[in-house]
Regions:
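Glycine-rich phosphate-binding loop signature in dinucleotide/nucleotide-binding domains
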Residues: 43-46, 130-136
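Short beta-strand scaffold positions
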Residues: 52-53, 121, 141-142
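Active-site signature of alpha/beta-hydrolase-fold catalytic machinery across serine-
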Residues: 64, 149-153
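Phosphate-handling substructures
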Residues: 65-122
């Protein structure tokens, strides 16, 4: 199964200043300009399935690119940072052991949230299910963390290294799940 996986365009919050994952935040005023580049990158491609995170930043891009009919799936949401969602990183660092969390981020769970391993498991479940259902080429609108989990599943990166480089906003990544084992 071949997958074209699209990261949403930039959002109104700065992820270097504010913690956001599965928080449903809006896109920036530059959305149409950014989304036009993504739409052009998808021109001429065909898919036997189109899926999207239900978060508005992914749904809006799917709609703009002509895929407003995409099937929404919660497994495609960004990592849930729980009580940290929407909080300034400066505050989290003051009140929470953030350095400890990032030192053990694969298994570490933010208060009320999920670990990277939990996110990885749900993302893997999604892609394995789609492959079992017989899809040959799908399009997915989602988030940087989901894309990095998918890259880990296909063996492109190790999970421990997955967040060293997030794909750019509005980028399209092509992955091959053909030889993936259940």
């Amino acid at each position: 199964m071949h997958v074209y996986i699209v990261r949403h365009t930039s959002v109104v919050l700065d992820g270097n200043e504010t913690c956001y994952g599965d928080m449903d935040i809006d896109v920036r005023p530059t959305f149409e300009e950014e989304a036009s580049i993504t739409r052009a990158a998808l021109e001429g491609l065909s898919f036997d399935g189109v899926f999207s995170s239900p978060l508005q930043r992914a749904r809006k891009l799917a709609d703009f690119c002509g895929y407003g009919f995409a099937t929404l799936d919660d497994r495609l949401k960004e990592m849930n940072f729980g009580d940290w969602e929407g909080q300034p990183w400066a505050e989290i660092i003051k009140d929470e052991p953030v350095d400890q969390f990032f030192a053990r981020y694969i298994e570490g769970v933010p208060p009320g949230g999920e670990s990277l391993m939990m996110q990885y498991a749900r993302v893997r479940d999604f892609f394995l299910e789609k492959r079992r259902e017989g899809y040959k080429q799908i399009l997915v609108f989602c988030h940087g963390g989901v894309i990095n989990c998918a890259r880990t599943i296909t063996g492109e990166v190790r999970l421990v290294d997955a967040f060293a480089s997030l794909p750019g906003f509005g980028s399209v990544t092509r992955l091959d799940f053909t030889h993936l084992e259940d």
